[in-house]
Each structure stands twice: as C-alpha cells, then as structure tokens.
Amino acid sequence: MEIQVVDNNVEKAIRVLKRKLQQEGLFREMKQRKFYEKPSVKRKRKEKEAQRRLRKKMRMMKKA
C-alpha cells in the first residue's frame, strides 16, 4: 500500500493511511491474530458475522 505525502503534510497522509487500513479490515485482523483462536471458535465467529451481514442486507432491501 502506498500513500503520497503532498506538500509535506504528513498528518494528512497518516489519516489517509489509517482510513485505508480500516477499510481493508487490517486492524481487526491484527486484533484477531494477537491470540490463537481455536477452529471451533473461529467457525462460530464467522457464522455470526455472516448472519449479521445477512440481517443488514435484508434491512437494506426492506428500506428500498
């Protein structure tokens, strides 16, 4: 990943970098990889996330 610094504005470049990392889910992945997650726990978490996405999608479809 590459961020360009314009006019020596490093603070803005850092904000842009943080936003891109957040959008790609890198912070969440680092947090999850900090400790070992058993396969059964990982599977349950993924199922829960899928259900959450499905509910969100259904809400969005209901509004439209």
Swiss-Prot record:
Q: Which residues does the annotated region (Disordered) include?
A: 37-64
Task: Give a Gene Ontology cellular component term annotated to this protein.
Answer: ribosome
Q: Which InterPro entries match?
A: Ribosomal_bS21, Ribosomal_bS21_sf
Record-given protein name: Small ribosomal subunit protein bS21
Organism superkingdom: Bacteria
> Which GO terms of the molecular function aspect are on file?
structural constituent of ribosome
From which source organism is this entry? Syntrophotalea carbinolica (strain DSM 2380 / NBRC 103641 / GraBd1) (Pelobacter carbinolicus)
Keywords, in A-Z order: Ribonucleoprotein, Ribosomal protein
User: Known Pfam families for this protein?
Assistant: Ribosomal_S21
Report the family membership: Belongs to the bacterial ribosomal protein bS21 family.
Ranges of Basic residues compositional bias? 53-64
Task: Name one process (GO BP) from the record.
Answer: translation
The coiled-coil segments of this chain are none
